[in-house]
Amino acid sequence: MEYHYLLNKRISFVKQAFIVGLSLFFFLPIKAYHIRGKVVDPTQKQTLIGANVVVKKDSTTILKTTQTDENGCFSIKDIAEPNISIAISYFGYKGITLHYYGNSSDIDMGTIHLLPETQQLKEVTVIGKRVIQKADKYVIIPSEEEINRVSASISLLNELKLKMPGLRINEALQTITIDGSAPVFMINGKKQPLSKVQGLNHQDILRIEYSNTPDLRHIDDGNGGVINFIMKTPVQGGFIMANTNQAITTMRNRSQLTGSYFKKKSEWSIQYNTTWRNSKKVYDNKNERFIGREYDIIRRQEGLPSTTKDFDNSVLLSYTYMYDPSTMLMASLDLKLHHKKDCEDNRIVEQYGSSVERYTKNYYTNSHYTSPSLDLFFKKALSKTQTIELNSVGRWSNGDYTRGMRNSNLYHQENNTHNNSWNMTHEVLYTQLFKTLSTKWGANYSHQVAENNYAENSGKRVTDKLFKDDIYLYGVVSGALKSLGYTVGLGGKMYRNATATRSKTFFRLKTTATFNYAMGRNWSLNYLFMYNPSQPSLANFSNVVQTIDRISVQMGNVNVKPSVWTRNRLLLLFNKNHISSSLQTSYSVTTNPLVNTYQYISDAASPYHGLFMKKTENGKNDRHFNVEYSVGMQNIAQHLSFQLITGWSRFSMEGSNYRHHVSKMYASISLNGYWKHWSAFANIDLAPQYSIWGTNLYSGTKYNYMGVKYHLKNWDFGLRLDNPLTKRGFIQCAENISNVVPSHSEYYISDMANMVELSIQYRLPFGKAYKKANRTLRNKNFDAGVNNEY
């Protein structure tokens, strides 16, 4: 009995000791360990810069992410989980995943070999550090130093622009162009507005896919190319960011509040944007000549101090649900509120023969509208090589527009327009990858209705209803033949434009072709061909006659035809170490360009007898020949970057009663310096770049600025001086070379001369950085069908 008692007591003691030991094993903290390694391409015997390294606890929980440095090495510290997986991936290469169990000591992974994807091997050419050229785009992988130097996504683009041929950025005006046109912005392949890009956490940007070739899918947006931000892998958490840009010397403010949260399979985000401007020193000088009467009417306009006020607000709510890695659903709701009021005062001297009349003119415009939109998107990966996407977008706009004029000689005119318009767009896109090429096929249908209710001087109201239907089918093939990458697209579009009583239908083919030839590691040659018919806006079809002033009226034209833009461009690109240079020449022709023609109404039976009619017509052709050279250096002594751009353009414009030729030079220089937490920047437009539209020649905005920024933990502070050492601020010039009403105008805002602006930004991250699933959503530009600028 005593033996059994002692035996049971000993067994009980062993059980208790085992339980205590097991408890200590589970509840004592595990020592944190580090992970390091090096990623290389064994086929090319070179390190892979910017490879993505993700440490996961399980299939959905991400612990940490990083990228390889200039030597292909990476290091991740303070991992406490014993069971982990490490996924390593790189653009154009087969990724690998390694698993570790029960680990508590440092892991040296040594050299990891990534092999190129078979179908992408021939398409990829490394043309510089962190720059990969594919058949249809450049892939830029920002370094940790480049990301830490800047405070926002637009600033990051400005830092990397040397690697993106054709890209122009004005941080002061927040404008971005590619070859003179606004690009399509995307986040993980999803088309987004610029405001959404401005709200990105730039530290979460994994790479930027840049194309200076308009994508056939978005070619009708009038874009110069595509900028696609690929974000890092999502983890639970998010961030809140607030920034404000306040002018000290005048009344201007631009602010943004952004919040995003990711958990498990869902992501919620909200963004609020507001812009408020009140300028009190706006000037518009203009000289006009009206030819057609017995004597020419010569009008000289001297701008007096005038005001312009605008207040814009927008709220964007979005939700993304990832059912599994191959299935995604997204919904977003956007609301825009716009208010603008201009009051322009001028001193007029008007001469007709020997008669001279002097008077003051008060010209005013008011516009306000509300525009909500709903965007639904679904994507499904049918297999490893096939995906299908469905997208529906609806937008509605309701607003009032007023345009009026008061003269000291008692002439008064006021036009009022109430606009109600809506648009629905539906699209399906199918993508398939093959061994040596990739394809995508799409179909898009858009229906738009615009109803305008017009009244002049509180008189009888006239209703004009306009309709537009588009059916678009397209296909794109990308691949490579040895060192020659290619992307070829072909589309067909049917246009239908209609009023309440008439309609016209057109069918036009569209095509783009891009060829990239890699001439070694540092040189590449690119050729672009575009053939792009485009439909006029709805306002161009309106036959309602509206009064401009006491001697002129304006109207649209339901019979105008689509314009056709044909472009050829040859680009030579050089990248080596810190130096980037490009030389390009282009020649473009627009047939049937839209032109605002003037004619004098001499028919005594016409209700507009004795007036000058401004009407939308088709001209014969516009031609533009351009040569441009760009050179820059980045990270000079690790503290300085600069870029110089210069070019020459020759424009030729021809119509039924006009033919003109104009040549213009342009040049600009930008500088960026950085030291520790400080950065300095400057942009100088030596000569503006010009553009044409019909018989009108426009100068680009000559806008110079310089400033400094300081980064402190989650805070960023900036101070900028715009248009220094000037009295008139920025200047925009326009010239109409019409044979009936030639004119020259000069517009400037003196409030923006020597303008000082303070910027403050605060970013509060919680959890880890996040990323949306890869998707391609097209939200077509909305055309309200109203024109208040005539």
State what each model feature region is.
Residues 40, 52-56, 89-93, 107-147, ...:
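Short, acidic, small-residue-rich periplasmic hinge/interaction motif at the N-terminus
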Residues 59-73:
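Short, acidic Ser/Thr/Gly-rich low-complexity loop/linker segments typical of extracellular
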Residues 108-113, 123, 127, 153-159, ...:
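N-terminal periplasmic accessory domains that precede
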Residues 172-213:
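Periplasmic plug
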Residues 220-227, 235-284, 310-313:
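Outer-membrane beta-barrel translocator/receptor signature
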Residues 244-248, 263, 274-278, 335-341, ...:
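Transmembrane beta-strands of outer-membrane beta-barrel pores
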Residues 312-340, 363-502, 506-512, 516-522, ...:
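Face-selective signature of the C-terminal outer-membrane beta-barrel domain
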Residues 523, 533-582, 589-591, 611-625, ...:
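Outer-membrane beta-barrel signature, preferentially recognizing the C-terminal barrel domain
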